[in-house]
């Protein structure tokens, strides 16, 4: 089955690469229209997925992530229309010029080809990824979470109908509609057809892809994010940033998980933190030094376990550790961070500069929330993932991250001397 999908995707990628921006936008508009027109069939498939997930004991929070409503589906369709408004990077000349030899050389953005994405049980990701791939002239092979495989299949069927209505092959967007996990291992070895693989899920999936894939893999999205409260930080602004970074959407990868507090500000800062976290319903996991100062406060406090410094809670839980200073904070981040998003709260320019230069994460902030690590917030439009590696993309992956480039030399019967 996957062999045939790969053949179809590769063939479709050659056609997509030749489309103009106007033609690609016409396809996206058609997809958005069809998603709204076929709302009933998609919601019916989704209802079956949600019912099965409830029988399997998934939490209410997870069920809410799985569920689609007419309003949510309308929002997904509107997001596709927003992709139409994004600048198309394909065909952009990055740089170039006339060489001494007389050869005119330019470096031009082109599609990657076929992109494979393995992702968690969020039905909106199917449409988000498909629309971004199509906008950049790439074909896509999608493998969504088993909890929403019916929803994904119904959604991709609608996308394929829209593609064919625009004269394009259905193979441009395909979904592995079986929940069989063995197919993931098979997909990881499809380097003959898939040019880049993006896993969006937990640490186990990322480890599997890094170790087993014969395809170049872009990993990321696991966010053990830190905020360091320096001794010069102003307490009230710092608390606002921490509340935003922890409570706005706790289940996201750019949520802060560990708070590092300079020992010289701890006695003034921690009581205020306890009050604020109690109001926000956050449980604090404190080291011995912090626990001694927090246990008399109103917040729910427990002793931190060593392994929790490596945990992505994705919940209203926050590690709190008192550190000797900036060097100690940087050392902790280097040991436990995932190179996602880390921040310093300080009024000392020298410390801010050191933190920015010495913390090796895809996004580093000074006096700002880690929640900004997002394609929309960065002005990139939608994102396909957040990369925490260094090649070839880093941070929120917008449209440009779904392209590569080729060198084009134009001569006038030019030969090398």
From Swiss-Prot:
Subcellular location(s) of the protein: Cytoplasm
Annotated pathway: Amino-acid biosynthesis; L-proline biosynthesis; L-glutamate 5-semialdehyde from L-glutamate: step 2/2
SS bonds (residue pairs): none
Entry's Gene Ontology cellular component terms: cytoplasm
EC number, UniProt record: 1.2.1.41
Record's catalysed reaction(s): L-glutamate 5-semialdehyde + phosphate + NADP(+) = L-glutamyl 5-phosphate + NADPH + H(+)
UniProt keyword terms in alphabetical order: Amino-acid biosynthesis, Cytoplasm, NADP, Oxidoreductase, Proline biosynthesis
Main location per the UniProt record: cytoplasm
GO MF: glutamate-5-semialdehyde dehydrogenase activity; NADP binding
The keyword Glycoprotein is annotated on this UniProt entry: no
Annotated GO biological process: L-proline biosynthetic process
SUPFAM superfamilies xrefs: ALDH-like (SSF53720)
Family: Belongs to the gamma-glutamyl phosphate reductase family.
Protein purpose: Catalyzes the NADPH-dependent reduction of L-glutamate 5-phosphate into L-glutamate 5-semialdehyde and phosphate. The product spontaneously undergoes cyclization to form 1-pyrroline-5-carboxylate.
UniProt-listed HAMAP family: ProA (MF_00412)
Descriptive protein name: Gamma-glutamyl phosphate reductase
């Amino acid at each position: 089955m996957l062999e045939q999908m790969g053949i179809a995707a590769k063939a479709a990628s050659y056609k997509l690469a030749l489309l103009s921006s106007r033609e690609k936008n016409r396809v996206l508009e058609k997809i958005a229209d069809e998603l709204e027109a076929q709302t009933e069939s998609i919601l019916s498939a989704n209802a079956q997925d949600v019912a099965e997930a409830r029988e399997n004991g998934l939490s209410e929070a997870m069920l809410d992530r799985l569920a689609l409503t007419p309003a949510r589906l309308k929002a997904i369709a509107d997001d596709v229309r927003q992709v139409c408004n994004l600048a198309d990077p394909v065909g952009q000349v990055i740089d170039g010029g006339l060489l001494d030899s007389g050869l005119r050389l330019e470096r031009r953005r082109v599609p990657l080809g076929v992109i494979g994405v393995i992702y968690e049980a969020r039905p909106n990701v199917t449409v988000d990824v498909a629309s971004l791939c199509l906008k950049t002239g790439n074909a896509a092979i999608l493998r969504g979470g088993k909890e929403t495989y019916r929803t994904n299949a119904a959604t991709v069927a609608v996308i394929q109908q829209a593609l064919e209505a625009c004269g394009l092959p259905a193979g441009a967007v395909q979904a592995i509609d079986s929940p069989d996990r063995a197919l993931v291992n098979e997909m990881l070895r499809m380097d003959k057809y898939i040019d880049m693989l993006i896993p969006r899920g937990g640490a186990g999936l990322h480890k599997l892809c890094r170790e087993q894939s014969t395809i170049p893999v872009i990993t990321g999205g696991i966010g053990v994010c830190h905020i360091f409260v320096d001794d010069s930080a102003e307490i009230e602004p710092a608390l606002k940033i921490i509340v935003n970074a922890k409570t706005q959407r706790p289940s996201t990868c750019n949520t802060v998980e560990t708070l590092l507090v300079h020992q010289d500000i701890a006695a003034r800062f921690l009581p205020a933190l306890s009050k604020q976290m109690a109001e926000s319903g956050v449980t604090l996991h404190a080291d011995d030094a912090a626990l001694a100062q927090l246990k008399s406060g109103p917040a729910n406090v427990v002793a931190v376990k060593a392994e929790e410094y490596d945990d992505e809670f994705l919940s209203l839980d926050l590690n709190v550790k008192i550190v000797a200073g900036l060097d100690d904070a940087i050392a902790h981040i280097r040991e436990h961070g995932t190179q996602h998003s880390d921040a310093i709260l300080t009024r000392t320019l020298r410390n801010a500069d050191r933190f920015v230069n010495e913390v090796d994460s895809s996004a580093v902030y000074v006096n700002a929330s880690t929640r900004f690590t997002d394609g929309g917030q960065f002005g990139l439009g939608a994102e396909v993932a957040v990369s925490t590696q260094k090649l070839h993309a880093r941070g929120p992956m917008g449209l440009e991250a779904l392209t590569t480039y080729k060198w084009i030399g134009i001569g006038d019967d030019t030969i090398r001397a």
